[in-house]
């Protein structure tokens, strides 16, 4: 397995290095994307594919009276997210679970906000995953997707060749999948190669 495969599912020592790098490397696009998220101070938030936990920490700050949960199928990512958010976990405001977005343990209509930063590239069955996100999101809730790559760059093909199981979607493709899952009010924001999409249930 190449080092870059750790972007999909971090494992072992290389995975630990990768999640630390992602926390730093993805910070600019994450901060940009979060400006399009109107979350209440007491919101219940889920971060799908939470990686190294940096975005969970940002969401906890954005929702100071809320609860933020994270889910990731990589044990390395779960461990790192728990370390990064140790204080909030001790306060009962945060939890990190290992699992798949395609089959989540959460109850229907549970979260006010769900986020997915730099992760939908790797979801194996995107329509199914979007339906599952829709299921656990409250009516009126917001789903935010934030990607560094929007499918319009020649470099995108290079990344999909290096990283197995990676698909870089264009905004129009994601919009169709979201609407098929039941979402509406799909809004698309772009900055250079960056893409942020918000959708309502």
What role is predicted for each listed range?
Residues 10-23, 142-198:
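C-terminal alpha-helical "lid/dimerization" subdomain adjacent to the S-adenosyl-L-methionine
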Residues 42, 137-142:
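Short glycine-dipeptide loop
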Residues 102-113:
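A short acidic, Gly/Pro-enriched loop at the edge of an enzyme's catalytic core
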Residues 113-125:
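A short SAM/SAH-binding and catalytic strip from SAM-dependent methyltransferases
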